[in-house]
Amino acid sequence: MRIVQPVIEQLKAQSHPVCHYIYDLVGLEHHLQHITSSLPSNCQMYYAMKANSERKILDTISQYVEGFEVASQGEIAKGLAFKPANHIIFGGPGKTDEELRYAVSEGVQRIHVESMHELQRLNAILEDEDKTQHILLRVNLAGPFPNATLHMAGRPTQFGISEDEVDDVIEAALAMPKIHLDGFHFHSISNNLDSNLHVDVVKLYFKKAKAWSEKHRFPLKHINLGGGIGVNYADLTNQFEWDNFVERFKTLIVEQEMEDVTLNFECGRFIVAHIGYYVTEVLDIKKVHGAWYAILRGGTQQFRLPVSWQHNHPFDIYRYKDNPYSFEKVSISRQDTTLVGQLCTPKDVFAREVQIDAISTGDVIVFKYAGAYGWSISHHDFLSHPHPEFIYLTQTKEDE
């Protein structure tokens, strides 16, 4: 948190309205160095661009990861600005013919096929273009899976090929000369916080992939193990134990004889969540029908994650004594307070009824762990408020 304090003080000293995203690119580099250097030799890290696709974020990340995982033509184009096409993998449901043609024409590394119909459409495009394409089949396993915030499989969802249909899709893919089936893509859980349980999930992936490869007699070259590594917003001191996971993961690879299979992770939240801060100031404090509210500059149209996940987002308060007005600030202490934005909706809530020691108008609120699924998923122009400004902290300077 100390890294953002000088920036906040500078903004306040200049009487600059405080409503910013601040990204710690130095911390991002250190994090990426650690996680990528600890992976086994047959494992590669891809960045799931959907978590945050700001150009300076992508530029920094591109120097450490094998490539980008993308889910649209627009994301392919963003990725191509920093990586060649053979370092881009294309997944996600509902790919259009236009997107598939674009991916094929650009030469993306692999396409993760989500259904028999998508496979047939891709094959028709390849025949029309007289090209070949490496693919993985995304499988929606039946489960059961460990506890996690989000489940992408094991229950009805729009993702992947139902496990009971996989055999038919494999046979179809193997019969298509333009299709090179390299293996499987699994992404069954999201925001898992237990590193030991994550190893168990990977073990299940290995078992399923090997069984299908042996049954259908094709070489298993590649498994995408998804992302799914979580962030604990409720307790920032108790996060996913990456080092423990990697050590057990390495052992599992040897035990399951997977050393000759290329393994991928496609992480997003785990890579960028902790390096972002949404910083805003208190405009008003008032009591309505017995409940205290602090109204902040901006709102969830800029930082939607707390509404999307229905949680109280972690924050710190920077107190400021200066008062630009001739009348007193509004101040409260030791009150349960709800932090809201400027939107004309009661759903515009960052944190609800949280105990606050002291808060005044003019104070600055710093929402931590705002680097993933913040600005990128928000409805920016609701009520036409100004957009936040963006500051990127590097070794030598602040970039805006």
From Swiss-Prot:
It is an enzyme of class 4 (lyase). GO terms for molecular function: carboxy-lyase activity; diaminopimelate decarboxylase activity. The keyword Lyase applies. InterPro entries: Ala_racemase/Decarboxylase_C, De-COase2_C, De-COase2_N, Lipocalin_CS, Orn/DAP/Arg_de-COase, Orn_de-COase, PLP-binding_barrel. GO terms for biological process: lysine biosynthetic process via diaminopimelate; polyamine biosynthetic process; siderophore biosynthetic process. The modification N6-(pyridoxal phosphate)lysine is found at residue 50. Pfam families: Orn_Arg_deC_N, Orn_DAP_Arg_deC. Pyridoxal 5'-phosphate binds at residues 228, 266-269, 373. It comes from the Bacteria. Keywords: Decarboxylase, Lyase, Pyridoxal phosphate. Induction: Up-regulated under iron-deficient growth conditions. Repressed by Fur under iron-rich growth conditions. Its EC number is 4.1.1.117. The active site is at residue 344. Its cofactor is pyridoxal 5'-phosphate. It catalyses: 2-[(L-alanin-3-ylcarbamoyl)methyl]-2-hydroxybutanedioate + H(+) = 2-[(2-aminoethylcarbamoyl)methyl]-2-hydroxybutanedioate + CO2. SUPFAM superfamilies: Alanine racemase C-terminal domain-like, PLP-binding barrel. Gene3D superfamilies: Alanine racemase, Lyase, Ornithine Decarboxylase, Chain A, domain 1. Homodimer. Belongs to the Orn/Lys/Arg decarboxylase class-II family. This is 2-[(L-alanin-3-ylcarbamoyl)methyl]-2-hydroxybutanedioate decarboxylase. The lineage of its organism: Bacteria, Bacillati, Bacillota, Bacilli, Bacillales.
